[in-house]
Design a protein with these regions (language model features):
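N-terminal acidic leader/helix
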Residues: 5-30
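Acidic, low-complexity intrinsically disordered segments
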Residues: 36-79
């Protein structure tokens, strides 16, 4: 499960990503280039030892940016 929440009231443009209801990480978007990067890795990804959810979130945010569809929140579940 992965939840994305748009960042408000900040100089950063991007999303908080929340994997498996744990502490969030941050995905940032460079508005000039469209580059999407992992700014802060979530605690869950750190415990896993690799940025699984960060990379998932990064890919989703890039797709949303390319389509210029940037909702305030988005939820994903897979099984």
């Amino acid at each position: 499960m992965l939840k994305l929440i748009k960042i408000f009231n900040s100089n950063s443009k991007g999303y908080w990503y929340i994997p498996e209801n744990s502490a969030p990480g941050m995905i940032e978007i460079d508005e000039k280039t469209g580059e999407v990067k992992i700014a802060i890795e979530s605690t869950y990804d750190k415990e896993l030892g690799y940025p699984y959810f960060a990379n998932k979130a990064k890919g989703i945010v890039k797709q949303m940016w390319d389509k210029q569809e940037l909702p305030d929140e988005k939820f994903f579940a897979w099984g």
